[in-house]
Every structure is written in C-alpha cells, then in structure tokens.
Amino acid sequence: MLTGSSGKAFILSILQASPSARDSRSYLSSFAPPQPVDIATATPAATPSDGAQPPAQNPLVNALLNPILRRPALVKIQGPFTDAQLESICRGMAHLQKLGLVSVIVVDRDDLPSTESSDRYEAQRQRAIVRHEVERVVHFLSRHRAAARPVFSTVARIADPELEPEEAQKGVFVEEEGLDHVRRAVGEGEIPVLLPVALDSGCRSRRIPANRVLLALASAMSTHTSSPVDLTPRRLLVINREGGIPSYARQGLPHLYINLASEFSYINRTFQPQWNDSHPTALSNLFLANGCLAHMPREASALIVSHRSPAALIANLITNKPAHSASLPHALLVESEGRITRDTPTLIRKGLPVRVLRSMEEVDQDKLTHLLETSFKRTLDREGFYNRLKNDLDFVIVIGDYAGAAVCTLEGKPVSDSFAYPPNHPEPICYLDKFAVHPSHQGDGTVDFLWVALRDETYGLGQLDASNPSIGSLRGVGRGRDLVWRSRSDNPVNKWYYERSSGFLKTRDEKWKVFWCDAEQRLGEIWREREFGGGRLVRVVEKEEKGRVKWWEEVIGAIPSAWSA
C-alpha cells in the first residue's frame, strides 16, 4: 500500500514519465507477469447483475504498482555525496525496486585514488571509507523501506595469466561462487550493495576501480543465465555529481542520446581539455557503458545522470528514452521550458552504424525493398521506384543492416534548356521521399538516430552540431538546404512530424500535408542581420521565401506513387 508523502512522490514520478503506448508495451513485456488464460473462465456466459461492474483494470498500472518479475540493473553510486544527496539517490533506488528493477550497486568515491595505496595504513584508511559508504547506502535504502544487503565479501577476482589464461584478457572476473551473493539478493528482492574490491592471486582482497567490478559483473550476469533467477542486467545507471557526457556540438552541454556504434570514437576525439576539470570521469564512464552494454541485451541502455535529476531514473526505466528527443529542433532543446542543462542525463545505447550512400550502386535494393514493404505494409513498385531514383537520387541514409533508411531525392530539376527556376529558388528541392524504420527497431532509438543523421545532411548542414561521424556524411561542411516531404493527412505519424518541422500545409485536395524544415544556417543569417539592423524579428515568410511553398506543392504533387496499385 502506497501512503504518505513518499507514496505520493512515487506515483507522481510515474505520471511525470508520461509513457506512450509503445513505452507501456515495452515495460509490460519486461516486468509484467505472463497472463495465463483459463479456458474454463476465458469466455464466461453473460449473467444478469444487480450492481455496477467494477472498472476494468489497467495492465500498465497494475504492473507498475505490483511488479512480479524482478530485473536487475547495474548501478554505480559515484560519490562522495552528502547525507541529503545520498538519501535522494536511495529514494530513487527504492522507487525503482517498487517498479521491479533491483539495483546491484557498487559504491565508488572519485575523491580517492582509483587503485589501492601501496602504503598499508593508507590502504586500510581508504578501505574503511568505502566500507562506510556501503553502510551509508544500506542505511538510507532501509529508511525508504527498500530491502538492502551489504556485501562485504569479495565477489570479483583479479585473473592470474598463468593459472587462468581464459580470464586473463578480462583482468577482473566474477566466478559462480561470487555471483551467488548477487543471485540470492536479487532472487529475494533485496538490493546488494558491493565494495569495489577483488581477490588477487594471493587471495588478498584489494580495492580496485569500481568500473572494473561493474564490467566483470556485466559479463558474468549476462553469461550465467541458467539459474531460476535471470540475472541479465537491463540497465546500467551511473549516478554522479557531473551529469551527462559533455557534447562538443552543444558547447559542453550534455549529449542527450549516444549511438555507441556510430559515435564512440568521435566523442573521444572531440572531448575538450577543459572538460577534464568539469567532467573528470566522463570518458571513463563512456568506456564503462561501452563495455557493459556489449554484454547486455540489445534493448538495454546506460544512463549517466546527476544526483540532482532523481526523476530521470524512473522515467528511464518506464520509457527507456532520453529526457528529450535528440531529433527535436536544436532551438527547442536549448531555449524552451525544461531545456537542456548541465544536469540533463545522457542515455547511451549500443546503437547501429550509420552510412550515407550517394549512388544507386551502393544501395542494396532487395534489403531496402524489404524494409519499405515491412514498414509501410504495402507492395513497392520496384521498377518505377528505382528507375526514378536512378535519375533523381540525392542520398540514402542507412542505419545498420537496413534497420532504418531515409531516401532523399532532388525534385524540380531542369527538364529542358528553357527551364527556369522560380525567383529565389535557384536549386532543386531536397525531398524526403521515404523515411522508414523496421518494426523490430521501433522504440529502440533508431528513429532518432536516423532523423539526426538526416538533419545533419540537409537543413542542419553548416552548423557546428552537424559535424557527425557517419560513414559517407558531409561532416557538417556545406550549406544547409530546406528539407521538404509529404504525408497522408490521416497519417498518425504526423504528430511526430509536427514537432520536428518548421511548418506544414494541406494540399488543395486535402489528401496530403506538405511539411518542411527551414535551413538553419539561412535562418541564423537572417536572424543576425535583423539583430544588428535594428532588432526586427524574423518574419513568418521572408522576402526570399515568397512563392516557395506553392512551388513545392506543385512539384511534389507530380511525384508518382512508389506503391503498386
């Protein structure tokens, strides 16, 4: 029973997560118990009733408040924290436990050297500090009625290359005996709180970096899955004082969403020297996420979050999404209410590589056809569609092995020597012909990664944050172009398009909506010109933009359908 201020705060934190229908299905698939069908009672005969029937129960609400399945998460509490700060963190851990996520916590103190001192007395002092941290965490968890278990035994071992050659590459590993401490706690719904220690080859317990213990746990918990308790971790949570991973493109504000397969090396290369002072553990936590997620399921994620953002923990569990969609307009992210701050968390996924293909010879037509037909549930007119692309292709962005794709064409090109572009429009239209994500990848971040790559190649080109590491991309070099596309008026995806477009209009027959994203570089130049020329605001339609929407509608309206009748 949830009562008092703590219970109200718990319910409020769930409501603030605002899960979508897809988020709800994802949460239910992981944490709700399977619903057995009783044949004898599956279709009861209708019987008269004198009283009102009780309202139907909501399965998401039931699963959130009464979870049956318990899933583990790896958590690093990276202190030092004051009592008030640590209590706030433990309150979040207690809420996660109520929702079915049992935290396997490793305490850390980034004010201590990462490895144990060679001086015996100093080493003992450091060990006493981290042991006290374990006791503090257990105390505050218990205060919030979260069953917790301090684990002072050593669960990890430092591999001896001569005696354990198979484990030597890992450096630190967890054996079945050590894993039993975690298994028993998770099986009983308790939160194990571990020391960052390991046994060396001489059976001496030594303090080691917490990251090495977490990496060893991620490997062992994902490998030893034969027991009744499934220990495969669903989340990695790093709670620190720094906040998320700083972004070069956002001038030091955090990354919202990181696609490790595409961005890992790039983030390391663009990490600025001054961030070593403001975010001294950012890169080590990025390496930690990369290593742990390599062992975890595809849908798993890592969250790097400040202790000042406790609500992000529950939002991440329920939605498995970043605090803000990374594909939203940059101005909306940095200027609107609820904008990005230093404390905004960074969500990290394994992700998929991103490629930009600029010729039909690079495109796998069979795989693209399968993606489009599966996503749209329609049959592609292959001959007509690919013949048109041979003449009009601008580029194709491909995520992974065609898990998603964006096809852009150049429309309104000269058809004869006498052809003349409309005034103020001296180039073809950059038209988003197809945008598709395979159903198996919907909800796992692929759509955001795809849209961000599309933005960087079109309307965001020329901006600092368009410098991305995608294979074949323009790396931010060039001049941005307006991006235009159309969608059926009754398409449920239009709500998503409204949030990302600069504007839209209905066609005369009202069957379509034409959307567009204005080139950010051009808008920035207009804004600066107005700012230094008297402060006049940018008009809804600037002089150089007059007539463009009418031209777009005419040209796009003439594009034939890509689908078979």
Curated annotation (Swiss-Prot):
EC number(s) reported in the record = 2.3.1.1
Q: Which PROSITE patterns match?
A: GNAT_NAGS
Q: Which reaction does it catalyse?
A: L-glutamate + acetyl-CoA = N-acetyl-L-glutamate + CoA + H(+)
| Location(s), subcellular | Mitochondrion
Biological or metabolic pathway of the protein: Amino-acid biosynthesis; L-arginine biosynthesis; N(2)-acetyl-L-ornithine from L-glutamate: step 1/4
Give TM segment ranges: none
Q: Name one GO molecular function term.
A: L-glutamate N-acetyltransferase activity
Extent of the signal sequence: none
Q: Where is the N-acetyltransferase domain?
A: 352-540
Where is this chain primarily localised? mitochondrion
Key words, A-Z: Acyltransferase, Amino-acid biosynthesis, Mitochondrion, Transferase, Transit peptide
Q: Which domain of life is it from?
A: Eukaryota
State a single Pfam family of this protein. Answer: NAT
Per the record, its GO cellular-component terms are:
mitochondrial matrix
Keyword Phosphoprotein attributed: no
Q: Which terms does the UniProt entry file under GO BP?
A: L-arginine biosynthetic process; ornithine biosynthetic process
Q: Where is this region: Disordered?
A: 38-58
Identify which top EC class this enzyme belongs to: transferase
Q: Which PANTHER family match?
A: AMINO-ACID ACETYLTRANSFERASE, MITOCHONDRIAL, N-ACETYLGLUTAMATE SYNTHASE
What does the protein in this record do?
N-acetylglutamate synthase involved in arginine biosynthesis.
Q: Which family does it belong to?
A: Belongs to the acetyltransferase family.
Protein name from the UniProt record? Amino-acid acetyltransferase, mitochondrial
Q: What is the lineage of its organism?
A: Eukaryota, Fungi, Dikarya, Basidiomycota, Agaricomycotina
User: Which gene is annotated as encoding this protein in its UniProt record?
Assistant: ARG2
